[in-house]
Amino acid sequence: MYSFLFKYIIIGDTGVGKSCLLLQFTDKRFQPVHDLTIGVEFGARMITIDNKAIKLQIWDTAGQESFRSITRSYYRGSAGALLVYDITRRDTFNHLTCWLKDARSYANSNMTIILIGNKSDMESKRAVSYEEGRQFADENGLIFLETSAKTASNVEEAFVNTASKIYEKIQKGDFDINNESFGIKLGAPTSKQDGTDQKPAGGGCCK
C-alpha cells in the first residue's frame, strides 16, 4: 500500500535518454540500445518521503513530433515532469523552450518540473555547459540536475527530489488532493520502506 501516488511524465527530444533514465530508476540497470519509444511507455516504483510510502507512476513519452499529440494528452493528470536534454547535443537544449511551452499549456499550473541534462558521463563531448542548464532552469523556475543514466549519477535524486517538491506542495495546500486531475492519488495512510515494483517496457533511449 501507499500513502500517495504521484504521476510523472518524462519529456524531451528523441535520443536524450528518457527510457534509459526510467529503466535505471526502476530496475537499476542501463540498457544502451533500445527500440524507439512508440507513443507512451510506463514504469513504477515505491519511494519513501517523510516516512510515507509514495508510489511513482512514470510515463515515458516518445520525442518524435508525430507523437506530440499523444504526449500532450499525458500532461493532464501529471503531478511532475522530467524535462530531459542531452548535454552532448545542443539541438536538444535549444528545443527545451518548445517542450516547456507545451508542458505549461497542457498541464495543471502546479505541476513540478525538473530540468535534466542527461549523459553527464560524456564530459569530453559536452556541447551544453552546466551553467547554461542552470541558467535556463533558474529563468523558468525549474529544479535542475545533470544526470547519467549509464552510471546512475543523480538519477535517484532526480525522481526523489521532484517527489519531495510535490509532497511539499501538498503540505502547503497547493493541491486539491481529492482531484485526481492534479496527478496525485490518496492511498492508505501507512508507512513503508523503499522498494520496487513494476518494470517498464524498453524503448526510446538512443537514436
From Swiss-Prot:
Annotated GTP binding sites = 12-20, 60-64, 118-121, 148-150
**Organism per entry:** Dictyostelium discoideum
The name of this protein is: Ras-related protein Rab-2A
Task: Give the matching Gene3D superfamilies.
Answer: P-loop containing nucleotide triphosphate hydrolases
Activity control, as annotated, is:
Regulated by guanine nucleotide exchange factors (GEFs) which promote the exchange of bound GDP for free GTP, GTPase activating proteins (GAPs) which increase the GTP hydrolysis activity, and GDP dissociation inhibitors which inhibit the dissociation of the nucleotide from the GTPase.
Q: Name one GO biological process term.
A: vesicle-mediated transport
Q: Where in the cell is it found?
A: Cell membrane
Question: What function does this protein fulfil?
Answer: The small GTPases Rab are key regulators of intracellular membrane trafficking, from the formation of transport vesicles to their fusion with membranes. Rabs cycle between active GTP-bound and inactive GDP-bound states. In their active state, drive transport of vesicular carriers from donor organelles to acceptor organelles to regulate the membrane traffic that maintains organelle identity and morphology.
- The reply on keyword Nucleotide-binding is yes
Q: What PANTHER family does UniProt report for this protein, alphabetically?
A: DRAB11-RELATED (PTHR47979)
S-geranylgeranyl cysteine: lipidated positions: 205-206
Region Disordered, residue ranges: 187-207
Alphabetical UniProt keywords = Cell membrane, GTP-binding, Hydrolase, Lipoprotein, Membrane, Nucleotide-binding, Prenylation
Topological type in the membrane = Lipid-anchor
